[in-house]
Amino acid sequence: MEIIRLPAFNDNYIFLLVDRATGDCAVVDPGDAKVVLEYLSKEDLTLKTILITHHHADHVGGNRQLLSHFPAAAVYGSEIDLQKRRIPGQTVSLKAGNHLDLFNRTVEILFVPGHTQGHIAYYFPPLQPEDSGDLFCGDTLFANGCGRLLEGTPAQLFASLQQICDLPDNTNIWCAHEYTLKNIKFSLTVDPENEALQRRFQQVQTQRQRQKPTIPTVLALEKQTNPFLRCSDRQLQANLKTTDPLRVFTKLRGKRDLF
């Protein structure tokens, strides 16, 4: 399976999962149908599957147009979003623990509420022990950040991020926005002593100056530099004047909202 990253809007990423042997593909969170259709036409690919992490327009806005070109494509999303009819064209309901088979890969469904109540993520475990898995997590975990609390509670999003932390450290994190540089600038205000974070800031500055994407990130790097995954770190707790990890997380999210 080949993963193609398609930029959309100002800072979104849409991901195509391509089986070159068959010419079939899936798309994750197609907020903009135009960029997807252009790539499919250029590469002569057939869209079979639409995977949605959550219902926001910049993640589902292209569904109807894609289905007009590929009416047989299945649209996957959470059971909560299906109940609320929030995902255009949704045909399949998913919940925590469900599994899919896609291009000879198993896909595990994680329920990761917080940003929205129905948010899910798609985890592709590695085929071989030495390989890396892939997580498509929408707006739950970002490179050096996390999603805003638009429908859920701090405790929900904190628990969702802990789920992600339980995945193997070499997991590739395919999040849906290019927010990395601003996230790192914020992180430095709350975790300035973090040398790994300082190094990452220099690297990401260079990448963005060259208009290079910073996605995917890797879970191990997030555990070293992302304050939202470091709420048990003693230095970060001292900086935020609390030893309660959930309270650290809640303070971080509030500060990031105002940054």
Swiss-Prot record:
Subunit-level organization: Monomer.
Chain positions recorded as Zn(2+) 1 binding sites: 54, 56, 115, 139
Keywords: Hydrolase, Metal-binding, Zinc
Pathway stated in the Swiss-Prot or TrEMBL entry: Secondary metabolite metabolism; methylglyoxal degradation; (R)-lactate from methylglyoxal: step 2/2
Role summary: Thiolesterase that catalyzes the hydrolysis of S-D-lactoyl-glutathione to form glutathione and D-lactic acid.
SUPFAM superfamilies: Metallo-hydrolase/oxidoreductase (SSF56281)
CDD domains in alphabetical order: hydroxyacylglutathione_hydrolase_MBL-fold
EC numbers for this chain: 3.1.2.6
Highest taxon listed in the record's lineage: Bacteria
Binding, Zn(2+) 2: 58-59, 139, 177
GO biological process: methylglyoxal catabolic process to D-lactate via S-lactoyl-glutathione
Name of this protein: Hydroxyacylglutathione hydrolase
Cofactor: Zn(2+)
Catalytic activity from the UniProt record: an S-(2-hydroxyacyl)glutathione + H2O = a 2-hydroxy carboxylate + glutathione + H(+)
Pfam families: HAGH_C, Lactamase_B
EC top class, as a word: hydrolase
Cofactor note: Binds 2 Zn(2+) ions per subunit.
GO terms assigned for molecular function: hydroxyacylglutathione hydrolase activity; metal ion binding
The family this protein is said to belong to: Belongs to the metallo-beta-lactamase superfamily. Glyoxalase II family.
